[in-house]
Structures are given as structure tokens and as C-alpha cells.
Amino acid sequence: MGKYNLILSEYLSFIYNSQSAVQIPIYYSSNSELEDRCIEFHSKCLENSKNGRSLKKLFTEYSDVIENATLLSILSYSYDKYNAVERKLVKYAKGKPLEAGLTVNELDYENNKITSELFPTAEEYTDSLMDPAILTSLSSNLNAVMFWLEKHENDVAEKLKIYKRRLDLFTIVASTVNKYGVPRHNAKYRYEYEVMKDKPYYLVTWANSSIEMLMSVFSHEDYLIARELIVLSYSNRSTLAKLVSSPMSILVALVDINGTFITNEELELEFSNKYVRAIVPDQTFDELKQMLDNMRKAGLTDIPKMIQEWLVDCSIEKFPLMAKIYSWSFHVGFRKQKMLDAALDQLKTEYTEDVDDEMYREYTMLIRDEVVKMLEEPVKHDDHLLQDSELAGLLSMSSASNGESRQLKFGRKTIFSTKKNMHVMDDMANGRYTPGIIPPVNVDKPIPLGRRDVPGRRTRIIFILPYEYFIAQHAVVEKSVIYAKHTREYAEFYSQSNQLLSYGDVTRFLSNNAMVLYTDVSQWDSSQHNTQPFRKGIIMGLDMLANMTNDARVIQTLNLYKQTQINLMDSYVQIPDGNVIKKIQYGAVASGEKQTKAANSIANLALIKTVLSRISNKYSFATKIIRVDGDDNYAVLQFNTEVTKQMVQDVSNDVRETYARMNAKVKALVSTVGIEIAKRYIAGGKIFFRAGINLLNNEKRGQSTQWDQAAVLYSNYIVNRLRGFETDREFILTKIMQMTSVAITGSLRLFPSERVLTTNSTFKVFDSEDFIIEYGTTDDEVYIQRAFMSLSSQKSGIADEIAASSTFKNYVSKLSEQLLFSKNNIVSRGIALTEKAKLNSYAPISLEKRRAQISALLTMLQKPVTFKSSKITINDILRDIKPFFTVSEAHLPIQYQKFMPTLPDNVQYIIQCIGSRTYQIEDDGSKSAISRLISKYSVYKPSIEELYKVISLHENEIQLYLISLGIPKIDADTYVGSKIYSQDKYRILESYVYNLLSINYGCYQLFDFNSPDLEKLIRIPFKGKIPAVTFILHLYAKLEVINYAIKNGSWISLFCNYPKSEMIKLWKKMWNITSLRSPYTNANFFQD
């Protein structure tokens, strides 16, 4: 257990290394006698340190505490002022500082100049182009690296090499930072003008990225890649990532497939030993040479050399190095441009009249027909969601910005806020709520903009549209998505599939007479040429749909939707440029509408169909699959003859020429063996994912706390690790220590222990063992979990005041009235709670809750107080089960080939033994009969928590619940009286438990939990018919077996003899499980 605690203690003595520094460990125990000793020990420690006496004697005297109790936290205090970083840094700053090239980037402000050259005065200064947007500082990052280096300077053998590589790279960073001095951050972890004016503008974000990269160096190759990226990204803040990652789109087409996995009829992956040769025309090699030349022009040497060497034999065995380069390129950090440049980027494309009108017509018609196909059924059947579209929209309204700040009155409280949900309430209270009028976004009311920053691409703008647009689009989009869910062409939406299924789909039809065409259409989505045909196609589809129904409300829904499209054809945006706000006519499609994802998918499908219909005039082929996935589309074409170099080249040129006829600036490629799209790439018949999540720089600031961000950091580290980019774990743990520590006063700090941060409680941040989610069952673990549950949710005065106001109450009761046919407390309370939770995105409320949370936490970390609780957690259930299992050794042979080469060995081993899964386990209850019944008659969507509560009520209460939601009495009676109801009980419980156990997150999402190989390691004699109990016993056993295998690389077998008498007790308990939300579960959700 104690690796984290050990590092923590070492870290504290590294940071506070002066005479005046003291570390006081705080222990706790669930055993009351030992707990008394813990308290005694603590007070004596405090007394001794106050009087400047040593604590050594106490450690001996209280050895019973130190050996048997659990470490809760470490209290540390130190009176030295905090310029320790600068002092320590000097030791490493022995190299030559980097000099930034001042003309490397096209846009002046993207050059890494001294801040005062870019922003002559404090008024002009903005940190928005270099803000790391993370609640940890450069000085903490430097400390974490120096701590690691000091700790490892006596390493030997291979470890010594790693130390030397990192030391060498850190010398570059330290020397450069030291030349200008370490920039000091303010309380919000921002870097102000006074601090930055005499330093290079991008110093902080560059140093963060560089630290992230150097702490991810293990091999010599890592070192070469990192050194090159660190040195060049100091000057090149614009195109470096793009240059380095461009070749991948061609590299995937060069590797022969020798055995691969394909999707079979049952949608499972099955091995196929087919051989497919990579057929590569010379033109492709010329394009690749050009890319490598561009890299060399930009000053890269080692990376192009590695690619060049790999090209000699293009083997899949050495391909992971290419994958590594591709992933590393993203870690140079986000490219953050000025909004004006981001907007003008899309408007720079010259508009030509010289386009193929015939193709545009076909494109528009395909969009129209697809829209009709998606909505035909719900419209013809006067679907209730389309009738009550406004209510549905209100219920799922987010608390994001509505584009302008307004003064709002809630009772006696007046606040300023930009949040949609508050604006809706305020408008309703003041009679300004008119969802039937879609406000124009023309020159009189231009659209405010948000931004999306991503490494290696230009900044994109996002429309922040008035909430009326959301309400008008919500229901129609939801219906389209339901259609897309059972249409395989829409890879992104396709029912519960994951990326492995899409992988098997592509490899399935690859053969010597097939080629795959893959296109990145992100340029097209935001190009001007797309906007008219795109919106017109949708409008025409809506017009046709309106003629299929006589229901006035459905027609109204379709008309409002149509109005959003009409308004957006004449859109202006407002862009702050300095202190003026520029209005620009913006004729392209931007994200920000509810329809963005769905409509782009429709358009991209229409686009590739248009192109294929053109080239089918010239070639004869069968289209085996067409897929669209976000900004990418791909299709596998099967010819009647074997594919030759000439064919590939001709098809490739014809496809490009076809796109050019629509003036679509897209990157279209043709290959016989692999594809590369934004989300994944396939090479040599294996699947790869880009491990490009930045750890020490964030895209934007939200209202998450340091604890939340520590959990997100860990979660990002895990995702990268699964995808083949590993950062030193000790470094990650050090960051977690820094980010979860709580300041009491200037010189007093409290550092939570591993137990606090890894126990499944409302404060969980990480797992003590990567990839293994532990649910503690020891006395001390359950004790601390209870203690934390008592202080989980904090009150906020502001929130209570708003919730008590008539504005808020009337809004909530209006929603309930529209939704319910009779009284239903569960739903009414649910709506009120949801609406109250939305208030959290209003900063003053989240700050107030955070303060309350921290003061409660401070008390708890010094002395945990438990409370008697009737609440049962998943831990309690597992604790009851555990004693009845007996373990024995077992053996499982490796029987599947590798298909995801980047996985860590211990995870790979498990997949090779038990197989992988291509589907998401249903964990939201949406497949249950009750959920389907509700969605048939009501727009209300109960959460899995609510379904779990409802399904365990008495039958007559369930009937009332259903009837109040508008389900006809006869249907409600039938449901409760049928077998389906008892199946539902089981099904919902199953979903709920899967949800609690995070079965679709981390590496668990890769394992086949229904594998017969896994099943045969588990023996549970069947007693009595309680399926729910059998289920939880089996699931627990599977997790135990898998966790053991991840940890030890070997298998165990479990035998369970669960007494019949206990079964009914356990079954009763299973209907009272409380779900725990923590920074850790939020981070998992955030990944999604």
C-alpha cells in the first residue's frame, strides 16, 4: 500500500529542507482504543514541535500507532519564504539558454518574443494565448522534476540512462527559465503582465509542455524525439505539431497486412490470417518525401531520420516508433490563436463560381433525403417528442453561456450572469420568454464567439447562440441521433459500439481487389461553399417532412427548426479585437448548434456518396462500406480485378479531382491496407490510437477545483498510457500531492494520504494501482469512506436563496406541470434538484461550495468523525461477499493475437488470454422496458439512479409513477402485472451495478467480461433463484480474477460457497446502494 505515502514523505523533506520545517503524520483507526492512541500521538507531536523538541522519541513510544493505524494525512509547516525553486533551479541551469527565432511563425504574436514587445502596455496584455489553464504552477512543475532528479541521481544500469536523458533535457529547460527567472503565478494560477513583461511570452506553456515531455522519456528514441520537440517548440508555436504528424496519413498505407482481426456477423472480433499487400504508387512516395522535406526545412533532423529509416522495410514490428512520434507531436501544447485570425481563417478561402453545380445539386438532395429518412417515422406518427419539443428542450437545457451578461433578480438578490438556465427563468418571470420567435443573428445582433483549441490544428470558433436555438433544435436532433444509432454508416453514433468494432469493419473487406478511400473533411465542414447547400438541404428536407403530418405542434417544431437554418444563412459574428468589437459577416458553418455533430455527419455522408457516384461513372466497383466518423469519412471499394499501382494512382487522382470540382479543400487518400482518421488509425492490420492528451496544459479554464484537476490529470495519464504514451508515474503522483494539498495558513499545509485519495469516496482522485479500481473492504477503509460521506455535499447560501425565490420556484413548477399528469414527487424533486445543480456553473456558488468543502475537509483530515449511516455503498456489498470466496492457482494460455500494439504489457496479456469486447455494456438502464415505456409517452428521461429507486418501489407506487408521466393506465397495469417487470428489476440493478463499478471506463472497457475463458475460472454452485445475487457474485469474481491478473501476470480461480441464508439478506441490501460521485468518476466521465 504505501508507495504514495513514502514518496509524499520524501517530497516534503525535499521541499521543506530547512531547520524550521516540521512534518507531523496524522493517523486514524476504526479500532476505538487505537484511535485514542492516535489522538494522543497527534497532540504530543504538536506540543513537541511547538516547543522545538524532536519527534523521534514519540515515534518509538507510539510505534503501535505507526504500525497498526492508517496514515490519514501529513501536516507540514515551514517558515522559510518560498524562493526555494529559484535556488534549486540554479544547480540545473548549467546549459546554454534557448534563443527564440523571432520570424519562425507567420503571425507575429505566435513568435515567442519578449512579452512587452508583443504587448507594450498592461492594458493590451492578455494571457489567453499562453494560459496553461491548469490549477498548478510552473514552479510546482519544476519542483516535481527536481525532486525526481534528486531522488534518482544514484540510479544504476538502465535506470541511470533514463536519469541522464532526463537530466540533459531538464538542463535545457532550467537554463532557459533561469535566464529570465521563474514566472510567479497569482492566486488563480495565472501569469500577469508585471511578471511576464520582461520574459518570453510563451515561456510558461512551453516549459510545462517540455516538462511533460521530458518526464515521459524512457528510451534513447524518446530522448531524441523529446529533445527535438522541446528545442523547436520554443520558437515554432504554430506548425510544429502538424508538420510532425502529417506523414502518418501516408505511413498507414505502406504496411502489408499479415493477419488481422475482422468483425464477424455477431459483431465480434475474430482473427483472420489474410495477407494483403500494400500497393503504393510513386506519387504517394513523392508526397511523403515532400512532407519529410518540410520537416527538415523547419529544423527537424532526428524525427525525419527515424521515419526515413523505417521506410526501408516498412515493417509493422517497428511501426510503434512511428506511432510514438505521432503521439509525441501533440505534447508540444495547444495552439492558441487570436479569435480574429481563427474566424478569418475560414473566410480567406476564395469563393469561385467555377464549381460543378450538378454535384452540388446531388449533394444537397442527398442531405435532404437523409434528413427525411431520419425523421420520416417520428413525423408520420406524430411522435410526442416532436409535439412537446419545447418542454424537452427546457428539461435538457445546459447551464452554458447564453452569449451576454444580464442583470437578473431572484427574490431580493440581484446577480449578473450569462448562463442559459438563469436567462430562461428570468425571461419566464418577466414575460419575455418567446420560444416561438427565433432571434435573428444578423448585423443587428451578431453572434458572440467561444473557441476550441487543439494541438496541431488552428483555433476554431464556436457560436454561442441564444437559447431559443437550442430549444428549437433539441427534439429534432435527438430523433436524428436515434436513427443514426442503428445505422452503421454513422460510426460515431452506432449502437453501443466502441472503436474496436469500427476497426474490424474496415479490415473485414480489405483484400487484393479492394481499396479504401479515406478523407479528412474538417476543412470542408467550416468552408463557405458548404454553408448554402448544407442549410438548403436541411430546409428542403424539413419542408418535405412538414407535408407528411397534420399535427400543428409537429409542424410548428419543424418550422422553428427551419427558422434556425434560415437565420444562420445570414449570420454575423462579433469579435473583440483589442478594445473594439468587430462585426464580421460569417458565411460558414461553425460548431455551437445542437445539430453540429449530427448535421455534419449527414453532410459528410452525403459528400462521400456524391464523390463515389461520380467516380463510379469511370470505374466498376462495389462499395462494401461507407462510414462517417466526426470530421472524417472512409469507404472500402471492391473491384473485379486485382488492384495495381496504376489503379490506386488513378482512383486517387480522380477522387481528388472530384473534390476539387466542388472546391472542397480536403485531404483525400487511397490505400489498400490502412487508414488514418482523427480518432484512430489502422496500420498493418492493427489498430492504434493517438496518445495526445496534454497533462500540464489545458485547453480552457472551467470551474473545477484543484482536486478535480488532479483526478483529470491522473485520468489523462491513464488514457495516454493505454495508448502508448507513458509519463513517469512518480512524477504524476508528485503532481497529485501538490494539487491535493490544502493550505491552512501561509506556513501550514495539510497533505492527504494515499488512503484518503484512493478510497472509493466522494474525494477519490486516483487508483493505488494503475488500471485496477479497488473497492476497499477493510475496517479502516470502510470507516474513512463513511466519514467522507458525512461531509459530501455542501450547502451554498446563494444557491439556497435563488432556489427559494419565486422566479426559480415558478420555473420548476411550470416544468413539472407541463410534464406531469398527476402528482409525482420523485420527478418533481428530481427536476428541482437538477435545476439547482445547474446553478453550480455560476462561479460565486461553486466558490462558496468549494470553501465549505475545504473547511470540512480540513477538519476531517485532522480527525475523522464517522456517523452511523443507513447508506450502503458498493464496498459494503463486496465486503459481505468477500469472505465466502476461496482462491486457488490457475492457468490460462495466451490464445489471441495482439491487435492493439500500444497497450501496456499487463493489459495486453489479459486481452490475449480472455479476448476483447466490441460493445459498451449498457449501464444507463435505457434498454429496460420501463425506460422504453416512459420514452414512448413522455419526454422525461429518468437517470439510472432514479430508475433504480423507482423499480424497487411497491407495485402500486410504480403504477402511479407511470400514470403521472402520461402512460395510459392500461399500459401501466399491464407492465406491473407482467413478467417484464421482474426482468426489469434485474436488468436495472445490473445496469446500476455496472455503472457503479465503472465497467465502461479505463482498461475494463477493453476486456470481454463474458469470455468463456474467464467464466471457467469461476465456480459458484447454483443455490436458490435470486439472479441478482448470482450476478453480483459472478461480477465480483470476474473483477477479482482480472485485477489479480493485471497485477501479477498470472491467473487465479475462485470458488464461492455462498450460504442460502445470506442470499436474501444480500439481495435486500442491493436495493439500497448509494452511488458516490467523486473527482475520479467525474474525470472518467469527462474522458467520454
Curated annotation (Swiss-Prot):
SUPFAM superfamilies: DNA/RNA polymerases. InterPro entries: DNA/RNA_pol_sf, RNA-dir_pol_4-hel_dom, RNA-dir_pol_luteovirus, RNA-dir_pol_reovirus, Rotavirus_VP1_C. One of its GO terms (cellular component) is virion component. It comes from Rotavirus A (strain RVA/Cow/United Kingdom/UK/1975/G6P7[5]) (RV-A). It comes from the Viruses. Pfam families: RdRP_4 (PF02123), Rotavirus_VP1 (PF12289). Transmembrane segments: none annotated. The keyword Zinc does not apply. Keywords: Magnesium, Nucleotide-binding, Nucleotidyltransferase, RNA-binding, RNA-directed RNA polymerase, Transferase, Viral RNA replication, Virion. GO terms for biological process: DNA-templated transcription; viral genome replication. Its EC number is 2.7.7.48. This is RNA-directed RNA polymerase. Belongs to the reoviridae RNA-directed RNA polymerase family.
